[in-house]
Amino acid sequence: MGLVLGIKAALIASVSCWAGGLWLSPDLDTRSNALRWWGALGFLWWPYRLLVPHRSLWSHGPLLGTTARLAVLLTWCLIVTMAVPALSPAVLLTTLQQLMRQHPREFIALLVGLEGSAWIHLILDGDPWPQEWSKKRQR
């Protein structure tokens, strides 16, 4: 990462991989250490836990799992901006777009680190594919 995008991006990827492993694990759909790390904010993952079956494509799928967890966080951020009069969902989304445009390398590094933490989790689980894919490969 450092050779391609620079040292700053490598540090961002490293920190996001660490944070992703602690707070954005594919196991947020179960009672897990990752869920406990959220403490009192663990309730934020209730809809995800309710809607996403464990080891499904949406929890453990390459790219899709990380995207789903980031979508849950973005949805909660948008809900907060709607609930707080001083904030605005449009401002949040515009700010996010500006950050992506102004700092594309850092944004890519952030996403690579988060996805990397998910892959590390999947490999440590012993089978890096969601259950749906594993069943198809066994046939």
Could you describe each region identified by the protein language model?
Residues 1-139:
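N-terminal membrane-targeting hydrophobic helices
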